[in-house]
Structures are given as structure tokens and as C-alpha cells.
Amino acid sequence: MNANGQQLRLFNTMTREVAEFRPARPGHVGMYSCGPTVYADQHIGNMRTYVFADTLKRALMFKGMTVRHVMNITDVGHLTSDADSGDDKLEVAARREHRSAWEIAADYTADFKTDLGRLRIIEPDVWCKATDHIQHMIDFAAALDDKGWCYQIPAGLYFDASKDDSYGELARLGLAGQREGARVEVVEGKRGGSDFAVWRTSAPGENRQMEWDSPWGRGAPGWHLECSVMSIEYLGRHFDIHTGGVDHIPVHHTNEIAQSQAYLADGRPWVGWWLHGEFINLRGAKISKSTGGGVLVADLIDRGYHPLTYRYLLLQAHYRSQTEFSWDAMSGAKTGLRRLLDRFAAARQDADAAQAKLGQAATRHLAAFDQAICDDLGTPKALAVVAAAARDDSLGDAELTVLAARFDEVLGIGLTDLTPADLDLAPGGAQVSAAEVEAIVIERSKARTQKDFTRSDQLRQRLAELGVIVDDHADGSSSWRWSS
């Protein structure tokens, strides 16, 4: 497990400390990630959470561990308030788009998986949909009810948080703090403000597409139930890591813990480590899908940005730090990633990596990278190490190619296969591909070399008409970029 040098240290939200990570079974990690609610496309704020979880998984594998990764798909149960009021988000989307909730879920799930691929996020070993586990959830809820943890009101079956002495420990709020929180909703008949729905009963005359029979009446599971049920189903009663966004801490993960500990009733922590990724902001405000805002991965592509440029942008900030999104920031990230790819792609062309042995300098770079990653996934420092290696003239091409492969095991930013030209995606509406632009730029460079400046100017004008800006450099080389 420690074959690569440093011990991996991670921040545990439950303890608020960075500590050495040790899975319950040495060398093997059970990891559960809260997946998307598939009522709309996931915006880039959502995708930051999944890039973080992917970086964590890659780091665990980089350290020699075997990871069993499970992710849910919420296709029922998530209300518009995130708590216990409002309509189911899938039902709202179905009315909005005049389609069935099942069609909505299927289409947006497919879109989400496409975006995972675009960002080189490794898919989980197990996908699990809430609607495929309804009976499991009913059985789980019945067990809680039988043990005296729940009470029934017209709105459904509710968990009595006052019976849990450690309720709110993850959020450091407790019952009083939860009652004061903005996201705690009032439902008629609830005994306490922190009580939450385990099963929601459909109201008389309510016309829902997604509802099932249960001992408490026809209805649907509460949002928090699916993650407890499916994580235990696929990872066992106790597992190592649970990930999500910081917005999951005060309600969703707090309630998952309460019902899971009550169900297990064995005095052991349900999950060993809780890790949460921070928000990315747009002009100072959290990017939010529920408020109708947000930029999609497809929007990045339409603007001519390779999705891995966005991944690179995210890795420039620590996962526990908020960061800002802007098109200027994307442009800067593209420049930074292009610089790395320029060096690694050139080395790749001339290298015989199969014969490479790392010398002292290369070994030091790899050790520094390992140290950065082992310090709670310190990707900003890790990227600085990558940049230092790219600038190190003492490294041979083969060494650099081997290092690129090791670095990219964790970073996933295309160091082993992308070229600078690959970053220049044609924006939406472009009349030519990046390859066609590259051919014109090469032709223009030849004209400049031959001092055929008339032809050079004609080609520059042609490129401008195609939405391309050409930059000529002092060393005689040229580069290009889309104008939008």
C-alpha cells in the first residue's frame, strides 16, 4: 500500500482533521459517492464534485490500493427544497418538458455519463439507481420503524432525530443548530424541526408518475434513504470513504448517518472517512442548477475549450477551497495546460519509454509529486511539480514520458496523449476544424519563411474570417487561438 513512498493523509470532515488514511482492509478501499439527481444536465459546479472524487480515487490507486467505487443515480425522492417540502425534482422536470419522469431520468443520466467521459472521470464499478432499489428501501424503513426510530404522520414515515444523541455530529450543529438552518423545512405533524422523511406518502388526489405501495401508504422514498440502502447493499455494513459536496453536509449526509447508525445498531461508525468538495463560484455566487443558472460542459466545448482545460482549472485549486470560474480563468488554464502538453508531447515523439530508467532528478520530481498528493490531495502543489519537471532540461525524453504517465495516473489531464493542438476545439458555429486551421497556419509559416509576405497576409486574413487569431513570436514561430 505504501510502495510509492509517502503515506496518504486525508481530511476527514467528521473529525475536522487531516490524518493518515488506513482502510479497514489493508490495500482495499470501499468508496461511495453521492451521484447526480437526473432532472437536468449537470453544470460545471456539479462536475467539480465528481472531478474531486475521481482525483481521490486515482490517488488511492496511485498508492497501490484497490478501490471498489459505488455511485448512485437519484431518479426519485429528491425534493425541490433538498429537505422535506416541495415537489419531486423529477416530477417537476417531467411537467416542464412534457415527458415522462422515466424518460427524463434516462436521458439526463446518459448526458451525465457523457460528461464524465469528457472530463476523463473514471466511471464507478457499480452504478445504482434509486428506482431499482425501492423494495430494499421499504425493508430498510420498516426495520427503522420496528426499532422505534420513526413515527407516522399524514405526510409519511418520519425519523425522530431527537432519539439520536449524536445527531448533527458531522455538521457540528446538533438539533438546535439544525432547527435554525435555512434548509430545515416545516411539515405539518413533524415533532421536531430536524426530523426527516424516510417514506413520503402521496397526498390524496396527487397525480405522481413515480410512486409505490408501502406499509405506510402509496408514495416514494425520502431522498436520504437511497444512499444508506445502496451503499450498504454494495459495500457492506461498514465501508471506508463517503464523498459528496459541502452542501451535502448539513442535511443529506447528516440524515444518512442518523438512519444508517440506527439501522446498524452495532456501535461502530457506519463510514470511516467523510470527504467533501467545495463550490466553484461564478461571479462570486455558487453555480446552482436548482436556480436555473450554471455553465455546462457542452458550453465549454461550444466556446472552443477542451473539457480537460476545465479539469486542469479545477486542479489548480485545492478541493477544500472555493474557486472562481470565468472565461478569463479558462483562457489562463488553457495557456498553462498547453505549455505542459507542448513539452510532454514533444518528448513523447522521441522517447523510448520502455527502455527508460529514472535518474536522480526524475526520481526527485516523482517523490515531490507523491508528497503533494499525499498531503490531502494537494493538486496545486502537484501541478507545480509537473511544471518543474517540464522545465527541467536535465531530463531525457524517455524519463519525461515515464513521469508524464505517472503524473497523469492522478491528474487525468491528457499528459500522455494530448497535443497542444487538441486543446483548440472549434467553438460552436465554427466553419472549420482545428486540424484545418493548423494546416493553414503551417502554410502561412512556410510563406513567412520564404518571405512571401503577401501570401502570409492573405492567409492571416483567411484565418481571421474563420474566427482565428494568429500570434507571431520573436523566435519566428506562430501560434493560434479561436477569437471567441
Residue ranges and their predicted role:
Residues M61, D145, A464:
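Anion (oxyanion) recognition and catalysis
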Residues N2-N4, K286-K289, G293-S484:
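Structural preference for alpha-helix termini/caps and helix-kink/transition segments
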Residues M1-Y39, D54, T114, I134-R348:
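Alpha-helical recognition segments enriched in aromatics with Gly/Pro capping
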Residues T15, A24-R120, F140, D475, ...:
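N-terminal, positively charged nucleic-acid-binding surface of large information/translation enzymes
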Residues T66-R68, G148-P154, D393, I469-D471:
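Short, well-structured beta-strand/strand-turn elements
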Residues E123, I153-P154, H473-S477:
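Short Gly/Ser/Thr- and Asp/Glu-enriched loop/turn motifs at secondary-structure junctions
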Residues V92-S100, D125-T131, G217, G245-V246:
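The substrate-binding groove and active-site-proximal loops of carbohydrate-active enzymes
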